[in-house]
Amino acid sequence: MDLPRRWLFRMLLLVATSSGILLMLYSSAGQQSPETQVPARNMAYPRAFFDPKPPNSENRKSRLCQHSLSLAIQKDRRFRSLFDLSTPVLLWEGLFTQELWNNLSQHKVPYGWQGLSHEVIASTLRLLKSPESGELFGAPRKLPLSCIRCAVVGNGGILNGSRQGQKIDAHDYVFRLNGAITEGFERDVGTKTSFYGFTVNTMKNSLISYAKLGFTSVPQGQNLRYIFIPSSIRDYLMLRSAILGVPVPEGPDKGDRPHTYFGPETSASKFKLLHPDFISYLTERFLKSKLINTRFGDMYMPSTGALMLLTALHTCDQVSAYGFITNNYQKYSDHYFEREKKPLIFYANHDLSLEASLWRDLHNAGILWLYQR
């Protein structure tokens, strides 16, 4: 082969070899090694504080969870010993056994069924017969690489003027509770509601107390789900009547028509019920207040907001908390929708100081993101 042809052949060979190397590098860059792949909640990248951004509707469910709270829990010595993400969050018929009845009959509500009618409990749970009733997001998750981002919106005055509405609505799911007024406050708190958490007592008290401020009905919507917190027999009776589409037959709410609160849809999939054992677990491990050992012990339970936020922390991959108590709570009104500033009052049935400390510590550990000003 003469010199020019030999030189040309070597140049072509060099180009082909270089192209192959580049192609291999490009291909490997688009793949993660087994050690860095993220299968849902349990294995993910370390949590970092994040500023929620609107998700891309086309690939939202296929994105990797790059800041999963589960790994942040694993990396924190204190919270690693407190969290048990395998704890059942919701109660449904499939979990209702004689053993469960015997156990929970030894504990007062909201931690059990002491003194409650077996027939009321059993007839309520029989209506929650689908496994879907035990899943907060409906059917069991089929996409292990999806990343569920949740916002839990409390009613704290810190949200007034916050302009967080768009960021709140950008989450996959939005939890609200009690007097969840959005009309007129869309810029600050958003409009999206995926879950509404309450006890019958807090729901009805909110409708009475905040009616003049704009809370004339609880959130309603086709894709909205209601999370009952079983603080008394009233919650079981209201839940049963809501699914059956009949008036409440007895108790303080006798004659109430649930559709006036929740709308005409009566499918069992519309309603969720927190497991009393889950509430016990949350109280024992995260919110074991000194109030329990005082004369107010029988009154004490975690606040509705605390239960919703901890529910999200046990079901979502990322959690942002808005409108929850912070160290500078005295700067703000009790609620964001109040026309005049009113101080936050600490009642004996909740330990808001303990809750504030917990939210701060979870934020500092990177397990949740707490909105602060």
From Swiss-Prot:
Q: Describe its membrane topology.
A: Single-pass type II membrane protein
Q: Which domain of life is it from?
A: Eukaryota
GO CC annotations on file: Golgi membrane
- Native species: Mus musculus
Residues the record lists as binding CMP-N-acetyl-beta-neuraminate: 155, 178, 303, 335
Topology check: give the Cytoplasmic ranges. 1-6
Keyword presence, Ribonucleoprotein = no
Pathway-wise, it operates in:
Protein modification; protein glycosylation
Gene that this polypeptide is encoded by:
St6galnac2
Lumenal membrane side? 28-373
Query: Would you tell me the protein name for this molecule?
Result: Alpha-N-acetylgalactosaminide alpha-2,6-sialyltransferase 2
- EC no. given is 2.4.3.3
List keywords of the entry alphabetically: Disulfide bond, Glycoprotein, Glycosyltransferase, Golgi apparatus, Membrane, Signal-anchor, Transferase, Transmembrane, Transmembrane helix
